[in-house]
Swiss-Prot record:
Amino acid composition bias (Low complexity), ranges on this chain: 282-291
Gene disruption phenotype: Increased levels of RHOA. N ochange in brain size or neural progenitor cell proliferation is observed.
Positions of the BTB domain: 40-108
GO biological process terms held by the UniProt record: brain development; central nervous system projection neuron axonogenesis; head development; negative regulation of Rho protein signal transduction; neural precursor cell proliferation; positive regulation of apoptotic process; proteasome-mediated ubiquitin-dependent protein catabolic process; protein homooligomerization
Chain spans, region Disordered: 1-34, 282-304
Name of this chain's protein: BTB/POZ domain-containing adapter for CUL3-mediated RhoA degradation protein 1
One CC-aspect GO term: nucleus
The entry's keywords: Nucleus, Ubl conjugation pathway
Family as reported in the entry's similarity comment: Belongs to the BACURD family.
Protein task: Substrate-specific adapter of a BCR (BTB-CUL3-RBX1) E3 ubiquitin-protein ligase complex required for synaptic transmission. The BCR(KCTD13) E3 ubiquitin ligase complex mediates the ubiquitination of RHOA, leading to its degradation by the proteasome, thereby regulating the actin cytoskeleton and promoting synaptic transmission.
Organism: Danio rerio (Zebrafish)
Coiled-coil zones: none
């Protein structure tokens, strides 16, 4: 039971005006109440929870509770003098504390905060309504932060891509799979790929789901998904013979990655069916520095095609011509 401290015990709780002692024997009987201004204390039965407070507290703000006290809103008062309000009493203590202090700590749970907002709107407490709305907005702003999931298993990845309604960009980055030393620029290019992934994640936050895979087979590989299927792939690693030894080379095909990221936006908001035909017709794809190949089922199998772009293919030492340092094999 909620109670408000008072200076004198001489105050009296509101009762039905004109009721005789004999009428109080009818338990549960309700009668329309009159103005409560003449009373100092009010007993409230809010959805089964009992609260004891003063008319002064209820009248602090221009609200439904004030109109109940001054008689402009008719209420029911039972035979024991309780003002009956047909509302959930779970958050009514919070409502009373707001009236007493002008502010009140709000629940951490968003669901409970929305419940308090509903009660504040019902009682027409504009101060509490604004307090709830501003707190909800702040929490939503925090929740809008950029979150990039880290893949922990192949099943998790498949489920995430299949159920996501947004386009998906995945960066596979597993340096543990490297068997050879890196070329001189590979470390820098690897960091550039990671930095670009972070920048794109911030730039397209809310429109594209960016996920990172550190358990896959590739050292550095971008994959692009739309409507639950892979649309394109950009592999940034290759094996080269630079000093009579195999070395791992990591490239940074920035323009190609940007292009594929923009292409994948065609699948945003369920617009994939039209975008699919456009992508497969080559209308939005331009030739890059690397080699591009498509996997599919030929005619009639266009829906299964995946554009795989390899910036550099494998380079064989025994295929280098005289005086040449590098030979590319397609």
């Amino acid at each position: 039971m909620s109670a408000e401290a008072s200076g004198s015990s001489g105050g009296h709780a509101v009762t039905v005006s004109g009721s005789s002692p004999s009428s109080s024997s009818h338990v549960g009987e309700e009668k329309p109440g009159r103005s409560l201004v003449s009373s100092k204390y009010v007993k409230l039965n809010v959805g089964g929870t009992l609260h004891y407070t003063t008319v002064q507290t209820l009248s602090k703000e221009d609200s439904l509770l004030r109109s109940i006290c001054d008689g402009s809103t008719e209420v029911s008062i039972d035979s024991e003098g309780w003002v009956v309000l047909d509302r959930c009493g779970r958050h009514f203590s919070l409502v009373l504390n707001f009236l007493r202090d002008g502010t009140v700590p709000l629940p951490d749970s968003t669901r409970e905060l929305e419940e308090v907002l509903k009660e504040a709107q019902y009682y027409r407490l504009q101060g509490l309504v604004q307090h709830c709305l501003s707190t909800l907005q702040k929490r939503r702003d925090v929740c809008r932060g950029c979150h990039i999931p880290m893949i922990t298993s192949a099943k998790e990845e498949q489920r995430m891509i299949a159920t996501c309604r947004k386009p998906v960009v995945k960066l596979q980055n597993n340096r543990g799979n490297n068997k050879y030393s890196y070329t001189s620029n590979s470390d820098d290019n690897l960091l550039k790929n990671i930095e670009l992934f972070d920048k794109l994640g911030l730039r397209f936050n809310g429109r594209v789901l960016f996920i990172k895979d550190v358990l896959g087979d590739e050292i550095c590989c971008w994959s692009f998904y739309g409507e639950g299927r892979k649309i394109a792939e950009v592999c940034c690693t290759s094996i080269v013979y630079a000093t009579e030894k195999k070395q791992t080379k990591v490239e940074f095909p920035e323009a190609r990655i940007f292009e594929e990221t923009l292409n994948i936006l065609i699948y945003e908001n369920g617009r994939g069916s039209g975008g699919m035909a456009l992508l497969e017709s080559g209308g939005v794809s331009s030739s890059g520095a690397g080699q591009s190949e498509e996997e599919g089922a030929g005619a009639g199998g266009g829906d299964r095609r995946v554009r795989r772009i390899h910036v550099r293919r494998h380079i064989m030492h025994d295929e280098r011509g005289h005086g040449q340092q590098t030979v590319y094999k397609d």
